[in-house]
Amino acid sequence: MGSLGMYSESAVRKKSSRGYDVPEGVDIRGRYDEEFARILNKEALLFVADLQRTFRNHIRYSMECRREAKRRYNEGAVPGFDPATKYIRESEWTCASVPPAVADRRVEITGPVERKMIINALNSGAKVFMADFEDALSPNWENLMRGQINLKDAVDGTISFHDKARNKVYKLNDQTAKLFVRPRGWHFAEAHIFIDGEPATGCLVDFGLYFFHNHANFRRSQGQGSGPFFYLPKMEHSREAKIWNSVFERAEKMAGIERGSIRATVLIETLPAVFQMDEILYELRDHSVGLNCGRWDYIFSYVKTFQAHLDRLLPDRVQVGMAQHFMRSYSDLLIRTCHTVVCHVGGMAAQIPIRDDPKANEMALELVRKDKLREAKAGHDGTWAAHPGLIPACMEVFTNSMGNAPNQIRSARRDDAANLTEDDLLQQPRGVRTLEGLRLNTRVGIQYLAAWLTGTGSVPLYNLMEDAATAEISRVQNWQWLKYGVELDGDGLGVRVNKELFARVVEEEMERIEREVGKEKFRKGMYKEACKMFTRQCTAPTLDDFLTLDAYNHIVIHHPRELSRL
């Protein structure tokens, strides 16, 4: 990235006593490793530091705006369309044309930035692989740095993995999926890298290191002259999209590549963002390749946004599917918004194959087919799959629905969704609240968190591939039911959720987890630590914004200067 020569030589030459060569004001507090040092070279760190210094005040202001919005919602306000940006929603404009490299996104596979996962996903037959630094990754130092190494090797085409247990070597096929990378959200700090005495912003570290090392090779090998490509999570307002757009423009300028080269799909996975979709696309119009329904996080956000609204309690989370009016309205408006301004839209399937039960596996695949057929008929251009085994079924549905067309951008404009109102998007979901719902939330939340604390962020549980979104839904729903003493339906009829009932549920579900995973795995794992953390979060007087921020404090390891090379 030759244009970084604009910085002074003295700024680049400072050496860290932890072993890394760092620019002025940068301190690496993670373990020293020679492989990591190739990623964390002084020019790459200078690039990340420049992004941090340029945009930190904008990020800080955006987070203050989030806190102010939360205060208003907790006092009784509800999200809605902004009258001040009505002109954007009602005027005619379009996003930049979709690059040929990503015109066809019928099926996308997602997963963490682990070496074997990257190879298998790129070889899976999907059109796109979203490599995840966010909800599918436990962001300890090793995972983050290995992830950057793995992605660099993947872009270079040199990645391989030797599975010693199976004596099998994994390498890339000639034809691979297009690579997208999802950095963390704006709210997540990177506690192993300090810039000017403050933790760096996690997403700027993820984006900055990946872009710095890979933009040139990516454009040659994957992007057909465009890219790199990204997914952007957890945004709540268009001002946050505006920061991303400015980050992209600065990165393009410093790399000496054409403006609009970087492209990103935004996940609409927070309730406030559904009222900002036009505005988000408008801010990113030169860098956008669409929106995606991040529906699990969207349900989490619904509960979090309405945490103080007794009249908006959710039923059991398994009942909050796309058939619920507020979820269907969200999906329909997202499709209309994207196709009006000529860009992509996608969805998600979390099921995984059930290898030891062919009948159950076929039932699961049939559920996937029905879900994907609904998405295709609604106008989605593609969908996510959490496992390679789902790709043929998903691909078949979208190919049959779209024929030879790579997408439905111009054929499924969804003008019928033009009259969707704020009430449609906020309508309370219907269903029952049961003791089994409380049990499932508790059992899944504890098991996911136990895996996360030991370095695994994508966890197969009960035939679904779960990431942090599931644990978040489980936590906030338990918290809300406890706060308001919800009366249970079904077998728990007349029973109210209180701390005594919850304590009994936790004890019984821990016994069940031990039976299911086995005594040895239970003893060696972090189930007890996860149980304490999950229980504390569910019974806290105030609701934390993110479970992962609390859990992150338990996986951060700062290495003393004198031990950094050990």
UniProtKB/Swiss-Prot annotation:
Motif (Microbody targeting signal): 564-566
Pathway assigned to this chain's UniProt record: Carbohydrate metabolism; glyoxylate cycle; (S)-malate from isocitrate: step 2/2
Catalytic residues as annotated in Swiss-Prot or TrEMBL: R182 (proton acceptor), D467 (proton donor)
The EC number(s) this enzyme carries: 2.3.3.9
Top-rank taxon: Eukaryota
One term under GO cellular component: glyoxysome
UniProt keywords, alphabetically: Glyoxylate bypass, Glyoxysome, Peroxisome, Transferase, Tricarboxylic acid cycle
Subcellular location: Glyoxysome
EC top class named in words: transferase
Principal localisation: other
InterPro entries: Malate_synth_C_sf, Malate_synth_sf, Malate_synthA, Malate_synthase_CS, Malate_synthase_TIM, MS_C, MS_N, MS_N_TIM-barrel_dom
Name of this protein: Malate synthase, glyoxysomal
UniProt source species: Cucurbita maxima
Upper lineage: Eukaryota, Viridiplantae, Streptophyta, Embryophyta, Tracheophyta
